[in-house]
Amino acid sequence: MEVDRIVSSHTYPDDKRTVMVRGLLAAMIQYHRSVLLLVQSGIVGPANSLTRNIINGLRFGLWVISCATQEHVHRIEEDEEFQLTPEMIKDMHSAYSTDPFFYKLKGRWDTQISKYTRERIIELGRWHTGLSAGLDFDEAKIRDVTTAATLCVVLLAAKFLEYQKHLTDSKQIETLAEDYPPPVS
């Protein structure tokens, strides 16, 4: 993935915030690769679950970059159960309120991304029975899942590089998102 190549081309300071977000981004890139492999293998349900993890990673990473205090960073490091609250997500959205790249993606993908973060019970409406029971995924839904996962990685990578003052590479990563169409499903 081009994003991984660009992000990995730099060395970063070893402060906790940077290490946390860089590690989160590395995990998201691995999840993204897994999503693509699962979809290529026809195993779409688990790809949805991994996409949910990628979305949560995006929100968490953007919040850490834009809103977390040093005390928050320390609490996150100490508390394995640390969760973002709706207020924290709102604060993160406010922090990026003037960022055109963030709001362009948010405008096109926010509704779809919100669908992927709901509890699994919501998926019951997509179950079918017959010769082979399971969740119903058409091509448009599969494309939307993989695109959402990709754009989350792209967005966090761009904002991480911007935070690290690698502005040229941040803009280069932002351009990768330009050709992705809006969601279909």
Locations of regions flagged by a protein language model:
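A cross-kingdom marker of C-terminal helix-rich interaction/assembly modules
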Residues: M1-L50, N56, F60-G61, S66, ...
